[in-house]
Swiss-Prot record:
PROSITE patterns referenced in this protein's UniProt entry, alphabetically: HOMEOBOX_1, HOMEOBOX_2
GO MF annotation: an example: DNA-binding transcription factor activity, RNA polymerase II-specific
Gene Ontology terms describing biological process: axon development; axon guidance; larval locomotory behavior; neuron differentiation; neuron fate specification; positive regulation of transcription by RNA polymerase II; regulation of gene expression; regulation of transcription by RNA polymerase II
Keyword Transcription among record annotations: yes
GO cellular component: nucleus
Residues in coiled coil: none
Protein name: Homeobox protein unc-42
Naturally occurring in which organism (per UniProt): Caenorhabditis elegans
Length: 279
């Protein structure tokens, strides 16, 4: 009888202590809008009686093992059973794989014709054109914008392939500009390379110049002016090349001939003075 009275007194004291602890906890958390316990240990510590754990009390049945089936118990085991996770686990595997795939729009032939006609007019349609296409094709405007982006990328790829087919990569010697640099501007080299001059049916003779020399230096361009005007070239390229050859090559010959004439005139008086005429 005395043991029962002692157990009842211990239970009453435990309840009173728990009520005081809850009251103190409510006062301390009065200024906070929300309180989230960090772990299950904090919650279990707030609900565990202060008395000896071996004693029989009113809260003896509150144990950590009893929470194994709850959300807190599953979080202790390392598995977080959130509602989204539970729903995903309940769905079959085929539905989960389909949800991960991108949604592809299948266009009809009439829709593709309308979109291609608009693309031929403008590769970058404005908002009004897209709205009109959405009304005609019964498509979403975002789908139309994505279709134009893919169509522009396909068009650029097609242009690159076409340019590679028209202009294949050549070597250094097969490049026309490099061939022109290699062959120079002399007629012998021009006659050996028939690639550039297949369109000309008659040969292009080199102009012969016969300048008149005098005692003074003369301008080589003036000496060859008559031959340049009489020569009828079929292309501006030949005129420039001939003018370049005539201004560079004959100038040295003209200067050498003029110097030879001057030296010849200077030697004639000396010979006349050394050999007096016989009477």
């Amino acid at each position: 009888m005395s043991d029962n009275l002692l157990n009842g007194a211990n239970g009453a004291s435990t309840v009173s202590q728990f009520q005081e602890k809850v009251k103190d906890l409510g006062v301390s958390l009065h200024d906070f809008t929300a309180y989230y316990p960090s772990s299950l240990d904090t919650v279990s510590a707030s609900l565990r009686p202060i008395s000896d754990p071996s004693s029989d009390g009113a809260f003896k049945k509150i144990k950590t093992e009893g929470l194994g089936g709850s959300v807190f118990g599953s979080s202790i085991a390392g598995v977080t059973n959130t509602p989204a996770r539970l729903c995903s686990l309940e769905r079959p595997e085929s539905e989960r794989l389909n949800s991960r795939r991108r949604h592809r729009t299948t266009f009809t032939q009439e829709q593709l014709q309308e979109l291609d006609a608009a693309f031929q007019k403008s590769h970058y349609p404005d908002i009004y054109v897209r709205e009109e296409l959405a009304r005609i094709t019964k498509l979403n405007e975002a789908r139309i914008q994505v279709w134009f982006q893919n169509r522009r990328a396909k068009h650029r790829k097609h242009e690159k392939q076409l340019n590679k087919a028209i202009n294949p990569p050549h070597s250094f010697l097969s490049n026309p500009a490099n061939t022109l640099m290699r062959q120079g501007m002399y007629p012998a080299a021009l006659n050996r390379d028939g690639f550039w001059y297949q369109s000309y049916q008659r040969p292009m003779p080199y102009p012969t110049a016969s300048p008149s020399y005098s005692n003074s230096f003369t301008n080589p361009i003036a000496n060859f002016g008559h031959s340049i005007t009489s020569f009828q070239a079929d292309d501006e390229f030949y005129q420039k090349s001939l003018a370049l050859r005539m201004t560079t090559t004959p100038s040295a010959a003209t200067a050498a001939t003029s110097l030879a004439n001057i030296n010849y005139q200077q030697t004639q008086p000396s010979e006349a003075s050394t050999n007096p005429p016989s009477i």
